[in-house]
Every structure is written in structure tokens, then in C-alpha cells.
Amino acid sequence: MKKRILTLLTVIAILAGIAVPVRAEETVSEDAVECLTEMPYEALPEEDFEFDEDSRTITAYIGTSVDVIIPRTIGDVPVENISYNAFECARDYVHSDMATNQKEGEWLPMRCLILPETLKSIEDSAFTHCHDLETVICYAPLENTNKGLFEECKGLKTVIFVNGVGEMDNYLFNYCKNLKTVWWKGKVNRIGVQCFGATGLEQFCVNAKNIDSCAFIGCEDLKEIHIRSGVENLNMTAFAMLTGIETICLEGIDPDVMEADWVNLQNSTVTILVPEDTTDEQLQLVTQKFASAYIIINKSQVQKGSCQLSENPMPDIDGIVGEYGI
């Protein structure tokens, strides 16, 4: 059974009364499609994959390379989907909490995964329990990642959405305890429930319209989080169980979009930064939100200050994949 919640009693308390916001829909314009960055790396041979031409879906990876570069086409048919079972060969159940007959070493230790821009959809949990997976470079402008795509990938460190992503769905990186870098182009419509639950993130810049309940719950190493402007809904339980948090930076946010649910963090040292041009009335409202959620214990913890980050550059992909000899 997947560990969706950190502790039952905690989440019963946290989630009581929470309404999950309706997903925002967004279409990709033709101009945006034309501007896509194409995957520059040579794909693995077509015969390394079982492929259903009718649905344009990869149904199984049967190759032996631990660094997997998905082809754009197989038999001249575009690769658009990846099924749930496609990477069953790379799932490590031995080092999970699941009952299994699998023996040590009976899985492919996939290290690096590169996805082409032709992909449109990947089924829920398609890479769950791929514990050896360290790096994912996604060129596909996915409208939705779907749920639990990389949940419990314990070795996952770096994920880059080169052409952006529409929605980062529930439990996307839940329990990816070694995850340090997640980068995406532009603004996402939604960061789902427990999307980054119990990850190893230490500093994080978030550019999103909607941030759902418990989005960052239990990220014990997270010290600093920057929320970009343009947020339309922020559920305060996103900050639950951030025991090491030092700074929450709001780079321009309307207090009315903050859902002040009970968090009970009661952190006496965290600083909440708001822009210098925040009015006294807005400052008071933001303070009330954090205080009523029991995130802070002293009103002086909410302060005006400089917190606007410069543009967050995309990590050096060539350098990252070069470590795998790609």
C-alpha cells in the first residue's frame, strides 16, 4: 500500500474540511508548440520497446540499457503515451514496503530517463518504485503529469521539465527523499495534493497558479521556499510539517487567495517575507492567515523585505546527462 500520508492522525487533523480546488484547463497554442525545445539526444533502438501502434503507446521496455532515451517514433508512428506497466522491469519491490517475491537484483537499475517532446501522456504511477532512477529530463509539454508518476523513487535527485508542464498532479514526487532539484519552464496551473510530500528539497522556487493541500508536507530539509506572484489559490496546509523551514517568501500575493486551514506548525523562528510595497492592511491580513493556521506564534515573524528572486535558469542538462556518458 502506497504511503500517501505521513501519519494518519496528523493528516486527519490537517485535511479536515479541506476542499480540493477545481483543476484549471489550459490549451497549448500552435505558436507555443512551434517553440518547443526538441530532445537533442539519440534515442535507444526501436526494438528495445514493445509498442502498440493503434494507441501510440509504449507498453514495455525490453532493452538492457540503464540510461533510457525514449524514441520519438517507432515504425514511423509517433510515440505519444507510456503505459503503467511499461517499466515494470525497473521496479524494485525488495526495498519498498510492499510484500514481494522479487529477489535482490531481479530488476533493471534504470538511472537516467529522457522523454521526447512527442509524448502526450504517461499513466499514473508509471515509474513508482524505480528506486535506482536518479535523473529525469522531460521534453514533453505534458498537460498533466498524472498521479504518483515518480512516487517513492528513493534515488531520484533531479527532474527537469524543459518545455514546462500544465499540472503537477497529486503525489507526483511523494517520498522521493533524495530529490534536490525540480525545474520547469514558466508557470504551472496546479501543484497537487502531497505533490512534493517528504522530499529532500532544501530550497525551492515555486511558480504556480494553484497550490493544493499538503503540497510540500513533511519536507524536513526544506529551509527556504519562494512563492512567485500570480498565485490564485494557496492552501496553507501546503506548509505542514516543515520542521526545518526558516524562510517563506511571498513574492506578491493577495491574502484573499490564502486558505487558512489548521497547520499547527507553531514555528517560533520561521520568517515570512512579503514585498516592501505591501500595504499595512495587506501585511495585517497575511499575518492573520499565518497566525490562524498556527504556522507562526508571533506576529513579528511576518516582515516586509526583499525576496524577489532573479530568473531561475534551467540547470545544465548536458552536464547532468554527461555524467552518464550520454
Question: Residues of each region from the PLM?
Answer:
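A structural signal for leucine-rich repeat
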Residues: F150-E151, F196, F216-I217, F239-M241, ...
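Sec-dependent signal peptide cleavage junction
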Residues: I18-A32
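Positively charged n-region of N-terminal signal peptides that target proteins for export
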Residues: M1-T10
